[in-house]
Amino acid sequence: MKTVLIPIHDGTVTKNLLRTDFLATLKTAPNTKIVLLLGSGDVASYEAEFGVPEKVIVECAQVYNRADKVELLFSSFFKHSIPTMFMKIRQVDWYWNKGKYGLYFGSSLLRVCGRFRIWQQFLRIVNALEPIDPKVRAVYEKWHPDVVFAPTMVSRVEVALMRLAQKDKKVVIGMAKSFDNLTSKAYLRIHPDYLIVPNQTGTQEAVGLYHYPKEQIRVTGIPQYDVYATADCIEERIQFFEKVNLDPNKKTILYAPAGDWMNDTDHEVLGEILKWTEDDKLPNTQVLLRLHPTYESKTEKLKGHPNLYVERPGTHFGNLKRYQFDLNDVRHLASTLYHSDVVINTGSTLMVESCIFDTPVITLGFDGYTKRGYWQSVARYYSREHLVPVINTGGVPIAKSFEELQNLITTYIANPELHTEERKKAAFAVCGEIDGKAGARAANVVLQTLQQIK
């Protein structure tokens, strides 16, 4: 009997992986048990949804406790070595803009060094020195997995399990959680035996940034978007608008803020849009405000406006950070994107999902009523590596003022087919073919590996 150990870092991994064909395909492996390792959470609900006696086992080891100072130090060391513009923007936000110039220059030095092979080799030596939580080690020794599958390669538990497996000469398969992971979160401190990436850009990033062997990379697409290819993905229009308490006969703007941490002037922009719905600038128009599941936004204070409906997606457990997305939530998002006339956001991956449904999408490149320099402005977000290919297609225009925003909204409402081809290119650049099979392709990487294990 072979064993595949899969740590489940958070609810996003559950949504993006377990609720796709990934697990269903993986369960077809003969003489193989699959262990889903929860850090914390409701074991009973996971067993009810995913468990299969003697086949899919749910384990909860309580190993996701707050990292100690040593772990935080190691984590920061690797994180700041990600050699990208994305990381530079973060370092400016975290340090330079707060007057912490010493920390900025120190972290920038790590980022510059991160491009060099000799530095990456040094980091792997450093990585081997990080203490491993005894609970993680106990889980590994309990199951002695033949394969460790790391769905994000970011969490400290995943990194520890990858280390233990490599030391034990077992197979490690890593996966880039989303199309921005390799440039923002997942410094490849450990080279897995196989690396799953969503697109060809991910291949270029793994090879170019981290000198990862190209022949060990597998391109699968993005599993969490598989549901968008299913026939029952979209709710009927009348049913959807009844659910969100909006008028199906009006034009609908979906406003999707990423949270005040990313754009603290969203409330100013949304406030102006609501004013436009009251006069002849945007007649017969309503707004659906879709808050981020985990981040606060001052836009919520506009709740109560007659042309606004507010929702926060997902099921939350005590606070915003602990939440779950089930298939109904995913289908609701798909229906929201499909039935909206225009989507507005700030540098969010939601722009890609809008393009999948060929819904006109506008992204904000100005800061409400405030004039800010580049390094303080939301305009900087569009220099991040994962968004550059999307913006370059021309399918997602950047509004640089209130006037441009109003003109774009009016233009798209009047002519929704405008930039259809460009939106197709944007979706393909990130997702490849949306055929509903990305989860199965990711699982097949594991199945092929299991076949090679004696």
Q: Where are the regions that the model predicts?
A:
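A short, glycine/small-residue-rich beta-strand->loop->alpha-helix junction that serves as a flexible
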Residues: 8-20, 150, 262-265, 436
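Donor nucleotide-activated moiety binding/catalytic core segment of transferases
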Residues: 135, 140, 294, 298-350, ...
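Conserved catalytic-core segment of nucleotide-activated headgroup transferases in glycan assembly
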Residues: 18-24, 225-322
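Conserved N-terminal ligand/cofactor-binding loop architecture of enzyme catalytic domains
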Residues: 7, 35-136
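Catalytic binding pocket for nucleotide-activated donors in carbohydrate/polymer assembly enzymes
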Residues: 190-192, 212-214, 349-430
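Nucleotide-activated donor-dependent transferases that construct or modify glycoconjugates
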Residues: 1-12, 39-40, 61-63, 254-258
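Active-site-proximal region of nucleotide-activated glycan assembly enzymes
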Residues: 123-127, 131, 151, 163-238
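Short N-terminal targeting/anchoring amphipathic segment
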Residues: 94, 137-156, 340-346
